[in-house]
C-alpha cells in the first residue's frame, strides 16, 4: 500500500527548496480527514495529509457506526464487508427493554456496523492514498498564518502552502489552539471509557445501550453504558457521561465502568478485559470552525451528538462537504462550509447541548428516561436521536418533535444555563 505520492509540487529557488504547494492540506488522518482527502483527490485535487501518529495507530472509540455513517462510507465507495453488521438498538432503562430495528425507507441505510477503529481508519486512509493523496505519518503539522489567513502548514522542518487547510485533528490540540478552534468553555462535553472482552454473544446484531447508569453514590448519570458486539469473538464495553451531571468533577470513570460491567457480565458471559480500559474526552462545541484559508471538520468542529457521544458519521459528512466545496471554489469555501454545517447540524446539536443541561438534574433525568422508552412511538424517536438520524432535513414525526423541542429549548437557553446542576 502506497502512503506517499509525488502529487505535491516542489517550488524551488536555484537549488534550495522554498515551499511545497498543493491544492488542499489536511491536518489529521482519522475518518474526517481521510474522507476529505478521498473526495478531493478523486476530484483531481493535489492533497497532502499530515498525522503525528504512525500508520496503523489505534483510536479509543466505541467502534459503532450508525446508518448515517454507513451512508457516508457508501458515498465514499469504501467497502465495509469486514465490519460486523448491526440491525438496530436494544435500549435498557431500569426494567424496560426495547429492541428496535434501524428505520427503513429513510435517506439512510437500514443497518449500521461495528468496526474497530484501527481497521476502519486504515480502510479510509488507504482509500485516500489510492486516490492519489500524499500521506505523511509521524509528522505534526501546525498552521502558518499571514495576518488572520491560514496560508499553509509547517511540518517536519518543511513548509507547505495551499488555498485551503482542513483541521481534522480530533479533540483540540496545538493546531486548534493556534486557530482559536477550542471548545467553548461553558458548553457541555463528555467523557468516555472503553475496553474489550470476549463474549459468546459477539455476533449479536443489535447494539445495546443502558440508559440508567448510576455513580458509586447512587446519583443518576446523564450518559449510557454500551455493549457493541464486534463479530470477531469480542465486544466493546464502555460508558460515557456528560459534564452537566451533578457531581461530574468527582465522577470516577473506572468505577462507573466497573459498576456497568457488573450489570452486564452475566447476561453477556463476559471474559476478562483484553486490555486496560482507556478514556477519552468528547468535544461538543468549538469557538471557531472556519476562517480565512481554513475550516475545521468532525470532532475538531465540535460535531459530536451530546446524546450518544457519536461523531464518526458527522466527521465523514463534514469532510465530504469541505472537499466538494474546495473543488468548486477554494476562495469561498470557509464561509460556504460554515453555512452548510449550520443548516445541516447546528439546530440538532445545539438542542442536544441544551437538553443536556436539563438531564443534568437527577429527577429530570429519571422522568425523561421513563418517557424515552415508555411507548413504541417515543422509543422510535429516541432510536433516531441515538442513531444520529435527526438533523435539519428530518421529515415526519421525529422531525416535527425535534423542531418543536428546538424552539422551546432555544427560548429557555438562558434559564437552562442559570439553573444547571
Q: Could you describe each region identified by the protein language model?
A:
Residues 43, 127-267:
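Predominantly flavin-linked oxidoreductase catalytic cores and closely associated redox partners
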